[in-house]
Amino acid sequence: VDGQVLSDYLFRKEISLSMAVENHWHGFIGMSPTANAPELFNLIYEKIFDPELKYDEFEEIRQDLLENQDKETILEKMLQRSPDRLLSARINELTGTGFARSSQKLSSEQIKNLNLDSIAAFYKKLYTNPQGTTYVICGNFNADTLMQQFVSVFGRIPVSSHLSRFSYPHFNFPVRKHIEGFPNDNDTQTLFDYLLPGHYQPGLKNTLTLKLMRDLIRNRLISVLREQKSLVYSPYISLMYEGIPQGIFYFDINASADNDNMPQIEQLLKEILHQLKQQEVDNEELNTLKRSFLIAKREALNEESPSAWRTALVGLLKNGETISDFDHYEQCLDSITPAMLREAFRRYLDTENYILLYLSKNKLKNDTSNH
């Protein structure tokens, strides 16, 4: 079928389908009215078993890569002109959530050896193996009817006894304190990301523990660094975690401050984290945080939010969390005690080996980078 004809047909039927390619996950994301679900299922089936291979377009792309190999890419130009983008890219490199920029370019030999048939064969082998494949269907529909339609299409996939296996090297965070700056034009202020990375065992309880740790740190950033000491502007902490395959996480404490305050901020951050390692948090504070988790979950996941359900369920899969644990979310959350959190702070955080990336016109005295 001509591509434009298919596109027009899908538009009329309100069907959309796109590929989702991430560092360690591949799949499809599709949406359609319930009445057109069989057509969506058949479209996915055809895509994985009989994809259209456009050799002419593939060759054009290859030649374009060869011609522009030694030229600066648009992304590289954007990075050089935007220190904050450089900083974000460096965070991804140092925490294992992205590839090093130096590894992203293919050599001329690698480009010449690219083969569309080999690429298609890899994806066909990946997508047509039911072992290790998970389908997530969310929406307002009759489950029995939809499952019959689903099975009538995907039940045709031959059974395989072989699970697709891929090996991933264990990601190692910097083994010592790493401090690196990027230039900006502000004479008096430093914008910084103070990163605390580590490895964890995937599972809902450990994920909730990390989220509680994040919010406990946030409370102290606001009360100590901003309200009591007035050292930072708009302090914020985020948590990134990736359960499968690496089991990695990092806390990112982000704020801006006057240049002269940076040494004091670093010392106070260490004191805050040291206190959380040594003392159990107050039950009242912990229970307040737990209630906020339950309220947020109730508000986000309801009968009118299929996309939120899809995001939540796919997140469980990617982070090694089970549906049964999620069914007992409240009990799992309630089981986390102040003593467990104190132990988690001790186990997960090394306050001496951290990553500090910053934007400043002035280089910090303790900068450990080579530039």
Predicted regions and their residues:
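M16 family metallopeptidases and their MPP-like homologs
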Residues: 2-50, 61-110, 130-138, 187-205, ...
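Bacterial peptidoglycan biogenesis and beta-lactam-recognition machinery
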Residues: 53, 142-144, 155-162
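Short, charged, amphipathic alpha-helices and their helix-cap/turn boundaries
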Residues: 111-115
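Non-catalytic, conformational "gating/processing" segments within enzyme and secreted inhibitor domains
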Residues: 116-153, 353
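Short, surface-exposed beta-strand/loop micro-motifs that present aromatic residues
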Residues: 121-125, 175-183, 344-347
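A generic structural motif
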Residues: 159-173, 237-238, 282-288
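His/Glu-based metal-binding/catalytic segments typifying zinc-dependent metallopeptidases
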Residues: 162-220
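Long, His/Glu/Asp-enriched segments that create or flank divalent metal/ion-associated functional microenvironments
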Residues: 223
